Amino acid sequence: MVLSIGENVTTSFEFAKDGLVGYWTRWLILFVAGCIPIVNFITFGYLVKIYRGVDVAPELEGYLEMFIDGLKLLIIEIVYIIVPLMLIVASTAFMETETVVETIDVSGMTITTGATIMPASEPTGVGLALILIGALLAVIFSLVATIAGIRFAKTGEFGEGFNFGAIFETINEIGWGHYILASIVFIIVVCIIAVVLSLIPYIGELLVMIIVPLLILWQGKFFENLYSCA
């Protein structure tokens, strides 16, 4: 069944809500695990379970398997972001520089005490181009990485996360325009919720942190639905 973007947002949210509300231990474990480096691989592993395609939120079991799957998913995500990240980092080599001369005045005589090369506030044309290209590629590669992660989850094969032919075929079936629009809509909805919660005095930021497990389930099911409807 093909879902509209609105239907996907709604049904995936219901999936997340039904999977956590009333299952407070599951919510707590995902929250705590997500806050601890390395242990948070378990959270990524739980996302892999959702990516495999389930009608209800899966049980939190098989922690070692989730840890390993989470590590594999994270590696896939990192590999895809390396290229745009390298371009953005390379742009710093093309930052304009200026020399700051340090002087002191002694009895009417100006004495130079040293000079320091400082980066200017704006990059050169080449640097700016690399930043823009890197940012654009980061967006594109993040879209590809999501489908790659889901493909890995569904096949159980790490190498399938780099099966570019199959990955791009899936994205073409989804439709690049639809995929990008759906991603933008989802991000906007999540940002609105996060901003509204953060504005609550005293407890706003804490509430945003608490709903992170809900957001993980929500986005996992949202993008799995896109994949499955292709």
Residue ranges and their predicted role:
Residues 31-52, 121-161, 195-230:
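Selective recognition of hydrophobic, aromatic-rich stretches within alpha-helical transmembrane segments
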Residues 1-2, 10, 84-142, 190-216:
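Membrane-helix interface segments in multi-pass membrane proteins
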Residues 39-98, 105, 113-127:
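Selected alpha-helical membrane-embedding segments in polytopic membrane proteins
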Residues 3-34, 60-86, 143-194, 221, ...:
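Interfacial aromatic "cap" segments that immediately flank transmembrane helices
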